[in-house]
C-alpha cells in the first residue's frame, strides 16, 4: 500500500490548466483498482493519493502518466506502508 503526496511547484493558475487531464488520469487508475482514495490538501498546496500496487516501481510508472508530473508542476513523495488494521470494508488490503 502506498501514500502518494503531491506538492505543487507551480502557481494554482498553471495547475488548473492541467486539472481536467489529471482527473482523467485518476479515473483511469480508479478503474484499474490501483487508486483507493484521493483528494486535495487543505490548504490547497497539492494532493494525496492512497494506492495499492505490487511494488514502488509500479507506483513510479503510474506517477509518470500523471499530467501534473509530465508538465513538471508537482513533486511526489511516495511512502510505502503495510496495513495492519483496517475498517471492515477495507479488510482485503490488510496484511495478515
Model-found features: residue ranges?
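Conserved, structured core segments of small domains
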Residues: 1-96
Amino acid at each position: 500500500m502506498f501514500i502518494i503526496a503531491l506538492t505543487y511547484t507551480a502557481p494554482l493558475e498553471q495547475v488548473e490548466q492541467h486539472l481536467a487531464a489529471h482527473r482523467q488520469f485518476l479515473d483511469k487508475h480508479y478503474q484499474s483498482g490501483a487508486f483507493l482514495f484521493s483528494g486535495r490538501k487543505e490548504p490547497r498546496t497539492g494532493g494525496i493519493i492512497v494506492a495499492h500496487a505490487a511494488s514502488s516501481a509500479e507506483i513510479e510508472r503510474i506517477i509518470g502518466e500523471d499530467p501534473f508530473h509530465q508538465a513538471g508542476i508537482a513533486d511526489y513523495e511516495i511512502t510505502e506502508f503495510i496495513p495492519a488494521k483496517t475498517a471492515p470494508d477495507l479488510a482485503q488490503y490488510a496484511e495478515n
